[in-house]
């Protein structure tokens, strides 16, 4: 079956079929191999790409820029203080302006409705670099990384547990990705931090077709047993006030990924994943504040696990670039 994603937006995985998602992962694997071998073919020569960042970023910005440059495209970075978007000009108007000047647009910001509006009116492919609800490019990288570290297996044969704040964009997106690809996902969190019930129902409906297994539980021991991968994210998301830390730390500490949790999987080959940045020690400004306030040297993951042989977080981070490149090539490439 020939799959063409030409001129498609990439706003959320719910918009894509399992075959289309697998196509993007396969393309990313091919592009990664070509780059390593020094034989990458450029398909974006002469293309101009706008990168809209209403939230700051390291990995997403670098991934989009390097991917674009590798493929021969030019980029314009519009940072949080470098444009009139939402202040003097609506997103609808911005979309129609940028769509006349650029061949593709990336957006990283707040509400999902904003990137959806951008995608509706731009007239060129729009890619979601992160919103409060979804982070689809991260999930492509995660699925690619899982396949790399489970040779000979397909995604429906893999299981993973996500611990922590499961109602954030990562919890949402991992659940959607697992549902679409027929995987076994366990979301382990306090019940008040489970994903929105409507999204859970939507994912369960998808799972009834794909064969995915979706488990929501408060029990760490039950949830992690037998999984291939452990996954976590920060406990306080971008944009949330510092005042939220105390309550969040109290609620989330039982869900920290530590050696005890690794042992509870019963899988000596279990791998650890994190979308980064991670609070795993006191070597950052925030890390020092956390240690002073709560006496903790790590939050969602301990230094021991983060730096262990089973940690594949930097493979995962690298794959952000390869999967983002795949999205741009598939939707915009010649």
From Swiss-Prot:
Any GO CC annotation of this UniProt entry: cytoplasm
Positions bound to carbamoyl phosphate: 57-60, 84, 108, 135-138, 275-276, 320
Catalytic activity entry: carbamoyl phosphate + L-ornithine = L-citrulline + phosphate + H(+)
Keywords assigned by UniProt, alphabetized: Arginine metabolism, Cytoplasm, Transferase
KW Cytoplasm (keyword) present: yes
Pfam families: OTCace, OTCace_N
Signal peptide from the UniProt entry: none
MF GO annotations: amino acid binding; ornithine carbamoyltransferase activity
Protein family according to the UniProt entry: Belongs to the aspartate/ornithine carbamoyltransferase superfamily. OTCase family.
Protein name per the record: Ornithine carbamoyltransferase, catabolic
Organism: Salmonella typhimurium (strain LT2 / SGSC1412 / ATCC 700720)
